[in-house]
């Protein structure tokens, strides 16, 4: 099935028994949709609040752009495009969030090595996620393979990007790597290996937050 036909079929199934709501938040809604024998994840912008509606739609469009840059990168769900209503259609990852798997994965060097390679590969393509500390933004499939999801606030750096955007990208890049350290070492920063210290450089905001608000 071509993407155009797929997007049309999925759009028609939203709101029917073939569409199962799995999450709803201020920013968006997630649906699991089955069509043509396959299961897809559909992300819709939450338009219930008029003042959040344009922001949420921008987030979906930004995420669509990011998935285009990361196309064919192993560990990134496939993106099939946007429906006519602006819904984002993605590959459905049959697994659990890192939040649900964190204790099972404690000490699993293979998983964290794979996750680090994925993050670095993402950065090399000019994408910084910026919110990987949030455990729900990491998915783990049945083979314990990591996936990165939810790129709504990610930033894309192009060669023509200006100084400010490149500076923001560098900060978010550090934040992504610091998030990897946080998940691998469970906030035990004094136990970071000498090799992994190369990936750890807390930002001023993170230092302030950890010292005066809570341990990140």
Model feature map: region roles:
Residues 1-20, 209, 213:
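Juxta-kinase regulatory segment immediately upstream of eukaryotic protein kinase catalytic domains
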Residues 32-37, 91-92, 141:
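Active-site beta-strand termini and strand-to-loop segments that position acidic
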Residues 56, 68-113:
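Conserved structural core of kinase catalytic domains
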Residues 63, 67-70, 119, 180:
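AlphaC helix (C-helix) of the protein kinase catalytic domain N-lobe
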Residues 114-124:
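Short C-lobe core helix of eukaryotic-like protein kinase catalytic domains
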Residues 124-140:
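Catalytic-loop of the protein kinase fold
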């Amino acid at each position: 099935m071509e993407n155009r036909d797929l997007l049309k079929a999925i759009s028609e199934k939203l709101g029917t028994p073939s569409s199962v709501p799995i999450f709803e938040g201020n920013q968006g809604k997630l649906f699991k949709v089955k069509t043509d024998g396959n299961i897809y994840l559909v992300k819709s912008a939450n338009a219930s609040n008029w003042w959040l509606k344009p922001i949420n739609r921008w987030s979906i469009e930004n995420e669509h752009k990011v998935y285009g840059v990361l196309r064919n990168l192993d560990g990134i769900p496939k993106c099939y495009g946007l429906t006519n209503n602006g819904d984002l259609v993605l590959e459905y990852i049959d697994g659990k969030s890192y939040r649900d798997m964190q204790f099972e994965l404690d000490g699993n060097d293979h998983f964290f090595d794979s996750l680090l390679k994925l993050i670095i590969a993402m950065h090399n393509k000019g994408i910084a996620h910026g919110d990987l500390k949030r455990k729900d933004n990491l998915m783990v499939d049945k083979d314990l393979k990591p996936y990165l999801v939810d790129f709504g606030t990610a930033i894309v750096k192009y060669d023509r990007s200006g100084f400010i955007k490149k500076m923001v990208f560098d900060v978010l890049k550090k934040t992504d790597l610091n998030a990897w350290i946080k998940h691998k070492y469970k906030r035990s920063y004094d136990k970071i290996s000498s090799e992994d210290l190369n990936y750890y450089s807390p930002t001023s905001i993170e230092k302030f937050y950890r010292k005066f608000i809570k341990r990140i």
